């Protein structure tokens, strides 16, 4: 699905469920990582996360579009468009839109660790960030620290 198809789908959903036209842009933003979509208050555009379409399918994307259209239409009408507002929650129920989207599967990231050892007492230090061992001393005996592996 490309941005043109997404625009058409968003316009159709707006007419079908809200009985109001969608006059702005709906597009995919591949920089979104943890959110399904967002409604931009200044431009009134809707940005959606393509990963939800790939991972969860068209139905999940339609739910996200309905959720963002709730923000869109309420904001343009001057009503409460935030998640905590009663108007927003009522409109979500009317159009059967999800309040939250299904979380994406997390990638198994191989976190790099750095191991340091004290040359005097043998105390080991495992760190997530690299450090310059010349600038630090052992907290146990004040001996010098040496990097073992990264």
UniProtKB/Swiss-Prot annotation:
GO terms for biological process: response to stress. It is found in: Cytoplasm. Its cofactor is Zn(2+). This is Protein SprT-like. Belongs to the SprT family. Zn(2+) binds at residues 67, 71. The active site is at residue 68. Disulfide bonds: none annotated. Coiled coil: none annotated. Residues 6-147 form the SprT-like domain. Pfam families: SprT-like (PF10263), Zn_ribbon_SprT (PF17283). Keywords: Cytoplasm, Metal-binding, Zinc. One of its GO terms (cellular component) is cytoplasm. InterPro entries: SprT-like_domain (IPR006640), SprT_Zn_ribbon (IPR035240), Uncharacterised_SprT-like (IPR023524). GO terms for molecular function: zinc ion binding. It comes from Bacillus subtilis (strain 168).
């Amino acid at each position: 699905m490309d941005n043109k198809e997404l625009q058409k789908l968003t316009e159709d959903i707006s007419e079908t469920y809200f009985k109001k036209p969608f006059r702005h842009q709906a597009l995919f933003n591949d920089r979104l990582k943890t959110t399904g979509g967002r409604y931009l208050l200044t431009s009134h555009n809707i940005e959606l996360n393509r990963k939800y379409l790939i991972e969860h399918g068209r139905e999940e994307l339609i739910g996200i579009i309905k959720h963002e259209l709730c923000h869109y239409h309420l904001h343009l009408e001057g009503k409460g468009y935030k998640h905590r507002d009663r108007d927003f929650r009522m409109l979500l129920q009317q159009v059967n839109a999800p309040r939250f989207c299904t979380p994406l599967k997390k990638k198994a990231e191989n976190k790099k660790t750095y191991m340091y050892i004290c040359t005097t007492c043998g105390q080991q230090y495992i760190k997530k960030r690299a450090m310059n061992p010349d600038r630090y001393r052992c907290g146990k005996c004040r001996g010098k620290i040496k990097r073992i592996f990264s």
